[in-house]
């Protein structure tokens, strides 16, 4: 079945907010279990999966910096939040018998494995899901940038960005009911129009390395596998 797949290895970017469900903070385990089930559906189809998780459901470094906290310190706290999310997602996925490894860009040997590129690729070759935590390990970098970098390092065919809306719009569809949706858009237009789908540094790196990005809503159950199979609602960002 794998030979018929358009994308054989993917990286899924899951925001911290996606793990909250309808809560205002923390984790909603029913929501996380649904996400894990969607990931399992993708794995069962023969796709190798890596994941980058955000930390915004627990801590947002850029917001803390706005109220006076040192930005670098705030970003490091945010990186720790991504480790909490990665371990939470790992435990839920393992309850569904999905073999999973957490690798952190910030070494914490008692908690998870350190990020080593060759080790991560070997895990994926063995059929394990790799969850990357700790962002890039550097302050002033978003988890979107981490997702693009890890996707390139893992030789992924596509980056799947799971969001709260079903694609890229010319303005916020939650605020503007007349917002126009793009079904395909190139990297240059995302940058030129300053579309807020992900930070512009991440888009620039994706463009330089010809990494396609698919943006879709994680709220619809089964959507991850649909997007990989060219079904459902999504926007593709490519050259």
Swiss-Prot record:
Family annotation (Gene3D superfamilies): Acetylglutamate kinase-like (3.40.1160.10)
GO molecular function terms listed in the Swiss-Prot or TrEMBL record: ATP binding; UMP kinase activity
Compartments (UniProt record): Cytoplasm
GO-annotated biological processes: 'de novo' CTP biosynthetic process; UDP biosynthetic process
Record text on activity regulation: Inhibited by UTP.
One GO term describing the cellular component: cytosol
Sorted UniProt keywords: ATP-binding, Cytoplasm, Kinase, Nucleotide-binding, Pyrimidine biosynthesis, Transferase
Listed pathway(s): Pyrimidine metabolism; CTP biosynthesis via de novo pathway; UDP from UMP (UMPK route): step 1/1
Primary enzyme class: transferase
Binding-site residues, ATP: 13-16, 56, 60, 163-164, 169, 172
Keyword Nucleotide-binding among record annotations: yes
Catalytic activity: UMP + ATP = UDP + ADP
SUPFAM superfamilies: Carbamate kinase-like
Keyword Nucleotide-binding on entry: yes
Enzyme Commission code(s) on record: 2.7.4.22
Binding site for UMP: 55, 75, 136-143
Function: Catalyzes the reversible phosphorylation of UMP to UDP.
Assembly behavior: Homohexamer.
Family affiliation: Belongs to the UMP kinase family.
Entry-linked NCBIfam families: pyrH_bact (TIGR02075)
PANTHER family in the record: URIDYLATE KINASE (PTHR42833), URIDYLATE KINASE PUMPKIN, CHLOROPLASTIC (PTHR42833:SF4)
Name of the protein: Uridylate kinase
Taxon lineage: Bacteria, Pseudomonadati, Pseudomonadota, Alphaproteobacteria, Rickettsiales
Gene (UniProt): pyrH
